[in-house]
Amino acid sequence: MHTSTSFGHQMETFGNHLTSMTAAPRGGDLCLMDVNGTVRFLTAEAGFGIPSGQVQTEKGIAVRQPCVHWDGKRALFSMVIGGPAKRYDVSYQNNRWQIYEITNLDEVVNQGKVANIVKLPGQPSYNNVSPIYGSDDKVIFTSDAPPFGLAHTYPCLDEYESTPINTGIFKLDPANGTVTHLSHSPSGDFDLFLATDGRILSTRWEHLKRDQQADETRFGSNDYEIKTFESELASAKPIVAPQTKDGKPFADSRGVPYEVFPEALSAEDPTRDPNEPLHDFNEFLIWEVSEEGEGHQTMNHAGRHEFGGLYLAASKKNDPNLSENFSTITKNKYHGTVSSDAGIFQLKEDPRPGQQGKFYGTWSREFKRFASGRIFEFTMPKGFNPQNLEIIDWTHPDIDNSSNSKGHFRNPVMLMNGTMLVSYATQSDLFSPSTTYHFQIAKMEKVSSTPSNTEHKASDRLTGAGIERTIKYWGDPAQPLEAVVKMNEVDIVEVTTRQRPAKIPVHIEDIEKQVLQEEQVDENQLRLWMKERNLSLIVVRNATERDAADLQQPFNLRVPGGVSTTPNGGKVYDISHLQIFQADLVRGYRASRPGRRVLATPLHNSTQNPSIESTNLLDPTGPQGSVKIGKDGSIAAFVPATRALTWQTVSPTKEPIVRERQWITFAPGEIRTCPACHGINGKTKAGNDIPQNKPEALRDLLRTWKSDFNDLITSVPEGDVKSEGGVTLYQNHPNPFVNSTEISYQLSKAAHVTLRIYSAQGQLVAILKDQKETAGTHKVRWNSASENSSQVGTGIYVCSLQVDGRVVSNKMLSIR
């Protein structure tokens, strides 16, 4: 329905998960339209919601983002229930968007039955939106649940406006309530879609920059009462630091340390390097990740050099080799038509046979457009080089320019019969209380004789004059607010069967696999060891090589005493270390702005990763949280899993040289290779192919791991008891066992417990517990059932107990 504001609205580009009456107006319905144009209101038929003309109180609903199952017999959607019950009531805003399922969609469609709508069990008690089915029928969604259960950091705040944001992509197994955080997004993921090749695609808000609210407080006129906490612990105190450290500016006049990554945002920042331009970043790009949380990157490794903007500032002012202009390697005409505060939304794949890898999306600006703009098409299947990307405009490219008279489009959906439907609003100006948008479903119709020969327009609306309702709800006035409005028709999906996607298998590159074999390291044991400690392994083969399209950061690079890559004459940069940063929720503001924002913090021990520093080959002579770059240019490090990370190469004098511009998340147990510095799409800047060297840094790390950290149990123990930090895991009984066994453990204090069973090869078999437990002794019986309810066979299994970052494990023997 219509609203008086667009900021934070459920149809907007970001912050669209909130539940106020302006953000999520109550009074809507989940609708079903048949081929004759007849509309049914499924939620109303099932007893949800309040009819038009009545006050939207405790039973008022808003709905969004349906997703039909592969077999067409079920459907997911998100719904928030409850509006203000009386004048001045704001308590309803504590109600959350939750995921619901229609379990009999085929009967609803074919037999006219009432939808059986049930709330999915086990989902987080936070705002859960954009639900989709996984290839294995698990449910994938975005949520504003705080990472690692850090409830005191709620709501997590974005890196731009410091407003509430979702924290990334999650996966729910409805069978047992297990929730997995697949990707941690400091500024939010939106519009999830599972492609036929198994990639979860999402629009991700890119904002890796310093805190502009902090700069406004320090150098502007608005005091946000910024504070940086000592850690993410609920008991952590705000830091009060000296203003200088080692003779350099360190903290402001209140003792709040300045941010350290990336470059300065304000010209008044005393930590600013005068040889570097100010750094700001605001763009929406498409990202991909597997259903297991691996392979997280921009879609096909396509970034701003392929998809966005008009130019990027060179990172070093005194280096004439660097340029603010894009490389001509990527000739995509899209570059000239977008700005830095925009991006791609509502991406959907063409479902027709033979069209896999073809996608349709909406290009929209950031504010006051309800994530609407122009429609375009591109083909980019998995493995496609994005330097060859071509954009096909389906609508006039001048949408959002002053000359636009074409209206605004969103939610493109290609039907199985080759018809494209969109949500269309005739309004061409920006949203305002006097210029409100009204979206209706329309068919796209090709316009003849246009320069592009691909331009389409919206034909007649499928609902005619639209769906009109009288909406009433309580606000501040003595009587309920009332308006007669046309309802927005958005989030279109076709009810049909679709190809179930292939699942992307766990992967390791051949070269790194060969190094593991040469060092006699069992890949599965290494993965299991990392999973138990919530770790991932990242590998770079040659950090002196750069992608040919990146002209903005240094590419004449040299490891002192080692490899060098210098495709151009001029300045050569020595790189000696990779400094790793983790997204810590430690920035807070005044009491009227609760929650936490992430800050890029050098890699360090934490509750979730209590021994990350000793696990790595960190160099105390380098910058904090850094590992040495090998003479061959290689890098290897264990890093926190399920937490956003970024990094930079630095010189022997600790000068940042090449910075990562995005936050990346890795899955527990993932072994991830980046062949060069930021990856290579085609050729390197030196004209070389992707590096094929065996990374010596990986070899060094594996040798240390084997001698110091490989504490996996190698035999079935007799009556073994493992204890660590107030956590005791007793040997299962009986052991060996037939059919079932009892597992006991003791906690010295209340804590969140995750009890997992792994195979001897490191594959997850079952999750027996994933919840908060009281202090004392607890017992769990395992009936030999795996995650898919099948019975396990004879063999050795590992029982792993994780409690607040500490992990203890025992082996068990099953006899069938």
Q: Which sequence ranges carry the predicted segments?
A:
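Conserved blade-ending motifs and adjacent loop-strand segments that build the rim/top face
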Residues: 182-189, 305-309, 340-345, 388-416, ...
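Short, conserved, GDST-rich strand-edge loop motifs in beta-rich repeat architectures
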Residues: 1-25, 78-96, 141-163, 205-287, ...
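Short loop/turn segments immediately following beta-strands, especially the blade-tip
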Residues: 103-110, 290-297, 303-306, 377-390, ...
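Glycine-centered coil/turn sites that cap beta-strands in beta-rich domains
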Residues: 714-733, 737-758, 767, 779-785
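Structural signature of eukaryotic scaffold interfaces centered on beta-propeller domains
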Residues: 62-71, 130-134, 193-194, 327, ...
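Sequence context surrounding c-type heme c attachment/ligation sites in exported
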Residues: 485-486, 626-713
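C-terminal tail/sorting-segment detector
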Residues: 767, 771-775, 779-781, 790-816
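Loop/turn-rich, solvent-exposed surfaces of beta-rich toroidal or solenoidal domains
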Residues: 337-453
